[in-house]
Amino acid sequence: MPQKVRIALDAMGGDVGAAVVIPGAAIALSRHPDAEFLLFGDSAKIVPELDQHPRLKAVSRVIHTDVAVSMEDKPSQALRRGRKTSSMWLALEAVKKGEADVAVSAGNTGALVAMARFCLRMLEGIDRPALAAIWPTRRAKCVVLDLGATIGGDAHHLVALAAMGGALASVLFEKPRPTVGLLNIGVEEIKGHQEIREAGEMLRSMNLPQLDYIGFVEGDGIGKGEADVIVTEGFSGNIALKAAEGAVRQMMDLLRSAIKASWLAQIGYLLARGAFRVLREKIDPKNYNGSVVLGLNGIVVKSHGGSDAEGFARAVDVGYEMARFDLLTKINQTLNRDGGALAPAPVAQEAVS
């Protein structure tokens, strides 16, 4: 466990860049005073923001580059233009060199996954990365992966996701044997694609000591909190994520419209304002910002590109916790216990945007 948690930030990533990243880092520092920051990007944009946060400035070092990966770049374009020189690559390279414990970026998802895979390389036994995030549930929280790092995958890939997701959940939720379910169209063993059924059979027969496989989970089971970890391939996972985020926004819009519809409803809102505040905190996607890119020889966290300073700070919080509680070692231990079960998966397609 490091004395200080060294966090490399892609200060040019996201819709706004340094204007969100620097204030977000300042918020995160107020929660984690033992953090230090490496800020990669255009110093002309970083320094004025940094001057407004003296405490952050005292524990930060700016590494200048005027090359940034745009939100429109395809992964192949980002690698051609930004390899070795972009703020995103340099943040990842700091982790590779041991200068930072974790890299955080709000930049282009596909580019980040491709660069991270190319720069940090994959863990032994893992063929492709996965995006994992915390999801609010009726009971508490759960980890869902893959949320779109790659598309498709065979049974071995799903088993690898289960192993990595279990390690992540054990760190986040302090559970030595978190429950794991495979996302499927039904809970019966005959339901779903062949690779899902095979993965279920493998997980059940392996009976891994570090995770408790409970079987198939339907889409509504995520919100019910039926498992600590929900495993799916990236295409379905990304659709589930976007659908859930859209449902939350729709619900909040409908609620606001209903409150404004009559003076009686507005009085009711005033009386129940505290309960509404708790509800918003519980379901606001901003409060769950920060997806971990699993499967790499290093810790990388992806922040939502449109997040505000508080949202970006949440992503930094996730990276801090992953480094502080040594996620990489836990994943390696889990994979080593699995032995030969994690065979290479087919070549992955590009990340979902």
UniProtKB/Swiss-Prot annotation:
One of its GO terms (biological process) is phospholipid biosynthetic process. It is found in: Cytoplasm. Pathway: Lipid metabolism; phospholipid metabolism. Its EC number is 2.3.1.274. Disulfide bonds: none annotated. InterPro entries: FA_synthesis, Phospholipid_synth_PlsX-like. One of its GO terms (molecular function) is phosphate:acyl-[acyl carrier protein] acyltransferase activity. Keywords: Cytoplasm, Lipid biosynthesis, Lipid metabolism, Phospholipid biosynthesis, Phospholipid metabolism, Transferase. It catalyses: a fatty acyl-[ACP] + phosphate = an acyl phosphate + holo-[ACP]. One of its GO terms (cellular component) is cytoplasm. SUPFAM superfamilies: Isocitrate/Isopropylmalate dehydrogenase-like. It is an enzyme of class 2 (transferase). Homodimer. Probably interacts with PlsY. Belongs to the PlsX family. NCBIfam families: plsX. Catalyzes the reversible formation of acyl-phosphate (acyl-PO(4)) from acyl-[acyl-carrier-protein] (acyl-ACP). This enzyme utilizes acyl-ACP as fatty acyl donor, but not acyl-CoA. This is Phosphate acyltransferase.
